[in-house]
Amino acid sequence: MESGNSTRRFSSFFLLGFTENPQLHFLIFALFLSMYLVTVLGNLLIIMAIITQSHLHTPMYFFLANLSFVDICFTSTTIPKMLVNIYTQSKSITYEDCISQMCVFLVFAELGNFLLAVMAYDRYVAXCHPLCYTVIVNHRLCILLLLLSWVISIFHAFIQSLIVLQLTFCGDVKIPHFFCELNQLSQLTCSDNFPSHLIMNLVPVMLAAISFSGILYSYFKIVSSIHSISTVQGKYKAFSTCASHLSIVSLFYSTGLGVYVSSAVVQSSHSAASASVMYTVVTPMLNPFIYSLRNKDVKRALERLLEGNCKVHHWTG
């Protein structure tokens, strides 16, 4: 194919993955299959525990269940295709599948970003306005915030996809990654379109910065509120309600920042893929463990859920 041809002339891209050493493919396949199964099972357990336990039918756990759903979809966007490619010893992905994967990945990446900000607002109201919590964070507001997060995420992904569809690629269409990632596609293009590149690179950063600023403001107000509590026990109880969310926020944004910095600084062909593992695979896998270990209500609900399943299995057996 000649340099400068439109992307519509390409039938497929090639995902280079982590390594070209075939001896490591089985190890990578087994590792990522295990992490994927743990991610799906862990987040499904969180969702089932919240649905089946009536005392968890609160705004905080409503958003947590949605975050678990997003984590499952977020990981499912990339890992199954990578596992299929390793199993079939193929690195190709069709042009249409690549754009679709990028679009869906952006939707759930932004959804996770916005849900963390919404959960921070929920914690802010709970800690700073406890007497008005049920009035402010009502069912209608929860649905509205969730729908708003979906709409913005889908709109952003749709705009980015339209931009990519107009790009021109030159030379090899090899992506040094294990999935079709927006930044990698923007680096492959030879289109000299400054507005398009600005939108592709700046808008995701701006959306993340807006959400993160909201989280920082919420926790600034929470810390100020906790500081005014006179007893140590009261301070500990107030902080413990935010500990799990704060841990997930720290993990999500630190790994995301690590991916952004590594892709901008390190020039190794497989460095971006390796750095993305923490953000795209490890973080969704750890989220259920963070909430189940640090949150007594979730831990108790999971124990009841598992005990109930054991009893059902005993009676049916």
From Swiss-Prot:
Recorded protein name is: Olfactory receptor 1082
**Tagged with keyword Transport:** no
Q: Whose protein is this, by species?
A: Rattus norvegicus (Rat)
Q: Provide the topology term for how it sits in the membrane.
A: Multi-pass membrane protein
What InterPro entries would the database entry show?
A: GPCR_Rhodpsn (IPR000276), GPCR_Rhodpsn_7TM (IPR017452), Olfact_rcpt (IPR000725)
Name the residues that span the membrane.
27-51, 59-80, 102-121, 141-159, 198-220, 238-261, 274-293
The tissues where this chain's protein is expressed are given as: Olfactory epithelium.
Segments in the Extracellular topological domain: 1-26, 81-101, 160-197, 262-273
Q: Which residues lie on this side of the membrane: Cytoplasmic?
A: 52-58, 122-140, 221-237, 294-317
